[in-house]
Amino acid sequence: MAVILNIFPDHIDWHDTFDNYVSSKTKILSFLSKGKSERKIIGSNMGKVEKNLPKNFDIKSKNNLKVHRELLLSLGEATKIIGGVELYNKYLEYIKKYEIKYPHRMEQFFELKNKNITFFNDSKATNYHAVSEATKLFTSGKEEGILILHGITKETVENKLNLDPVFKYVIIPEDMNIKLGDHNAEIIHIKHISNLKDVLVKVLNSNQVVLFSCGGSSFNDFEDYQVRGDYFKNTILSMELQDD
């Protein structure tokens, strides 16, 4: 059994080229038993992995899945192999109860129910890919998205931020070097993250999702992503927003 995750340009720091990075990640496949014929490639990296496989390597593809589902499906496949159906069912029950409810990772911490405004803290998202995938999680909703970025970005040739069209506002600190892909959002620059509250007061309305998914490391303003996430949550709660 082998699980390969996160083959994306912002992870190539130590490999010089993207091809070297993919080759290094897929080396684990050489340790698999040759007697096993079925291989599953789950998610959006199939093409990158497939070209590193032997020609007689039989695979079954499950593609077009969002990042969180890729991780969950990979863990599910591993659970089946290790513990069979009984352990797999326990895993499913656990996921239903705890999936993406960890602090600073798509953490829903506040909601105005009457106005239908929900606030998410995703401070742990420190690269473009994590942010891009986070915005896709709201595609099916009727809410308008407000994305808040922050931090020191990783710059690579292939790396850019791709937003789901549901996000109509993007708030960016002036000192953040950001590379946006195609989008239809209004870009709002703020002098510093401490000025966030002033901007939010102007754009908050109703039927909205407010996503603090940063796209960069926290060290220019905070000790770590946890302190940054707590800062955002405290900022929102201190606004004492009314739900009437």
Which role fits each region the language model picked out?
Residues 155-209, 243-244:
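C-terminal helical cap/extension that packs against the catalytic core
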Residues 215-241:
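Glycine/aspartate-rich loop-and-adjacent alpha/beta segment that forms the canonical ThDP
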Residues 65-167:
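Nucleotide phosphate-binding/pyrophosphate-handling subdomain across enzymes
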